[in-house]
Design a protein with these regions (language model features):
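Catalytic machinery of carbohydrate-active enzymes
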Residues: 1-319
Length: 319
């Protein structure tokens, strides 16, 4: 059976969050599912070997002349999808556009969120209700990314990862300046951690200028000999490194989602993002700004993330 799932939200985090629901479709019909996703989901880097996913199709949208943009782009997308002869499609949004595209593509069975109800949709609960309604399945929010043991062992050898040390992923990047906790906060935690334990730190970030400033501040600190930067390698190559870690401490970034999905206890520093993004997985331990009962967009609390709270949860995890 040829089945398509459309997940058009941006970013790695959203793609990871939707994994359990896509896998549920595959299990229900005993058939791998193809997915249509945006390029910035980076799905090809961490889902290529997922047994529940057959093909990863890229939605080419984003600027005015992209292949799938506008009215002409809609017909281009319908034409592209028609080549695969999909029998069913599950659309994880309320867009009439995607509904019509799938009709034009000749897909007979179309399952979709209620049309025109995008406002105030809860990211996870809406997906859970959708799968319950269409497939009568109750799905927990616990994404899992599996890796081959050989990849994990190769990374352990290549990066001299010692199991006698506490190996810590520090996800110091973030999708915006209000989500990036200062280097000072991470250094404060590192000082507390190394006073009590032999630690090694893997610094995960992108190449954005501000992220590089934070990275270099840590690399130029007293802990530089304990640090391994990961900014120059692909996400695909970071996964087995992360899997070798004892714990992850991350801003709200792609790495908080990836590490939790790799079954690594992940402390998520939420300064300006809805709490749900750092608490949906049982592997996540959210920390919010001092003085707040919750956190959302425009909380602007990165200066009130407390390193002592990070250290307290860290010790609870590693002891």
């Amino acid at each position: 059976m040829k089945i398509l799932a459309i997940q058009n939200r941006m970013g790695i985090g959203d793609m990871v969050i939707f994994l359990p629901f896509i896998e549920a479709i595959s299990k229900k019909f005993n058939s791998p599912v193809s997915i249509l996703v945006k390029e910035n989901s980076k799905a090809l880097e961490y889902l290529e070997k997922n047994k529940y996913i057959e093909k990863i199709l890229i939605l080419e949208r984003g600027n005015n002349n992209s292949h799938h943009d506008g009215i002409i782009g809609s017909f281009n997308l319908a034409k592209d999808l028609k080549k695969y002869s999909f029998e069913k499609v599950f659309i994880f949004n309320s867009s009439l556009r995607f509904h019509l595209i799938c009709k034009i593509a000749g897909i007979k069975e179309i399952f979709q969120y209620p049309l025109f109800q995008k406002k105030q949709q809860h990211l996870i609960k809406t997906a859970q209700n959708f799968i319950k309604k269409e497939l009568d399945m109750d799905i927990d929010s616990n994404p899992i990314i599996e890796l081959e043991n050989s990849l994990i062992e190769n990374a352990k050898n290549k990066y001299n990862i010692n199991s006698d040390q506490i190996n810590i992923l520090l996800g110091i990047g973030g999708s915006g300046p209000t989500k990036r906790i200062s280097a000072y906060k991470f250094l404060n935690f590192m000082k507390m951690a190394t006073k009590e334990d032999d630690c090694k730190f893997f610094l995960a970030t992108g190449t954005n200028e501000e992220e590089q400033i934070i990275l270099n501040e840590i690399l130029n600190s007293e802990f530089k000999e304990r640090c391994v930067p990961l900014d120059k390698i692909k996400i695909k190559e970071t996964l087995p490194i992360i899997k070798n870690c004892t714990v992850a401490i991350c801003n709200d970034s792609s790495f908080s989602h990836l590490s939790a999905a790799l079954d690594i206890p992940t402390i998520v520093l939420l300064s300006d993002t809805p709490l749900m993004y750092g608490s949906y997985s049982p592997n996540m331990y959210p920390i919010i700004p001092d003085g707040e009962e919750t956190v959302t967009h425009d909380t602007l609390g990165k200066e009130r993330i407390n390193p002592e709270k990070i250290f307290k949860i860290f010790k609870e995890i590693v002891t």
